């Protein structure tokens, strides 16, 4: 007898992120791809250096990576770095907090499946 594993039926782990815009928009973040996860880990290790030296180009790239992170969501909503800064009013400190929470979330997911 054939068995079926339907990945569509599995519940995805979700991290809800509520932003500061007027609508208090909520993004339901999901687990990233392996490539995305590697980029997030790399960026997390650079954050203290970026905060210390305030390099505008690196901060811009960090906002772009955060937009990619937030775009990895259960509702398939894509956001840009510009939207994060302008529409959603994110600051550099918010990025640090989001990354820390997201990495904890992905660690919990990895620990749960092992």
Language-model segment annotations:
Residues 12, 25-114:
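Short, surface-exposed, charged amphipathic helix/loop patches that serve as local interaction elements
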Residues 20-24:
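Glycine-centered tight beta-turn/hairpin loop motif at sheet-sheet or coil-to-beta transitions
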């Amino acid at each position: 007898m054939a068995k079926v594993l339907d990945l569509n039926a599995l519940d995805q782990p979700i991290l809800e992120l509520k932003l500061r815009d007027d609508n208090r928009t909520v993004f339901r973040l999901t687990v990233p791809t392996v490539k995305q996860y590697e980029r997030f880990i790399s960026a997390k290790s650079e954050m203290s250096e970026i905060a210390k030296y305030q390099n505008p180009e690196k901060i811009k790239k960090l906002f772009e990576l955060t937009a990619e992170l937030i775009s990895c969501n259960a509702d398939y909503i894509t956001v840009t770095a510009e939207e994060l800064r302008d529409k959603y009013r994110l600051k550099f400190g918010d990025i640090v907090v989001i990354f820390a929470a997201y990495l904890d979330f992905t660690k919990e997911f990895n620990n749960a499946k092992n």
